[in-house]
């Protein structure tokens, strides 16, 4: 009975006999059904890429963004329920703002990730609330700490990463990320690879149209989190499409 959650999945405060909290697992399912987001840390910054699915031709271009500014030096990429993610982005902004007001300098990313992770975890403890149905990555760059990247999942666990992927194609994306020499690459190099990975893992059969969202924070932006300029994004998309075309042609030749 416990293996399918019968009777034990009604509340986030209830454990099943085999030690599982089904509401948290269901929240993770919401993330797994979402479009893919990846973050890669390199020697001079962090680059985020998001496959934002376009569910209707009537949507205005650029709406429902999945990349957020949390602070001047911190960016956030999300997968899962967008409304939940926006709520957590506001919480993260409040934490960053309060820290600067109290201490007079930018919040360290490790501290911010831990604070928001504790907030997310609190929503897995009580029957009156439900877990957040999203995972998100936080990235920053500073002269003292260098590039940093953290991921927080619906259970409230926070991990530091060199490369991370969340969403429906996370396994395929992680496989591609592992092929990269991230510690030797710059943000300019990584932007192209991020675009390429998003195009590789995109499922053209199930999900026809998508918008590629790219942002970065690093030396190239003087430590500020910014959306990648249009010309750089278009160059990255062109590189991604050409790489895919070359791979398809080589596969055809091998056959």
Curated annotation (Swiss-Prot):
GO terms for cellular component: cytosol; nucleus; proteasome core complex; proteasome core complex, alpha-subunit complex
Modified-residue entries (Phosphoserine), positions: 243, 250
GO biological process entries: proteasome-mediated ubiquitin-dependent protein catabolic process
Gene3D superfamilies, A to Z: Glutamine Phosphoribosylpyrophosphate, subunit 1, domain 1 (3.60.20.10)
Record PTM N6-acetyllysine, positions in chain: 57, 206, 230
Pfam families reported in the protein's UniProt record: Proteasome, Proteasome_A_N
Major location category of this protein: cytoplasm
Chain segments annotated as coiled-coil in the UniProt record: none
UniProt superkingdom: Eukaryota
Alphabetically ordered keywords of this record: Acetylation, Cytoplasm, Nucleus, Phosphoprotein, Proteasome
Subcellular location: Cytoplasm; Nucleus
Transmembrane stretches, start-end: none
Modification type N-acetylserine: residues: 2
Purpose: Component of the 20S core proteasome complex involved in the proteolytic degradation of most intracellular proteins. This complex plays numerous essential roles within the cell by associating with different regulatory particles. Associated with two 19S regulatory particles, forms the 26S proteasome and thus participates in the ATP-dependent degradation of ubiquitinated proteins.
Subunit note: The 26S proteasome consists of a 20S proteasome core and two 19S regulatory subunits. The 20S proteasome core is a barrel-shaped complex made of 28 subunits that are arranged in four stacked rings. The two outer rings are each formed by seven alpha subunits, and the two inner rings are formed by seven beta subunits. The proteolytic activity is exerted by three beta-subunits PSMB5, PSMB6 and PSMB7. Interacts with AURKB. Interacts with CDKN1A. Interacts with MDM2 and RB1. Interacts with the C-terminus of TBXA2R isoform 2. Interacts with DNAJB2.
Recorded family membership: Belongs to the peptidase T1A family.
Name of the protein in question: Proteasome subunit alpha type-3
Organism name: Bos taurus
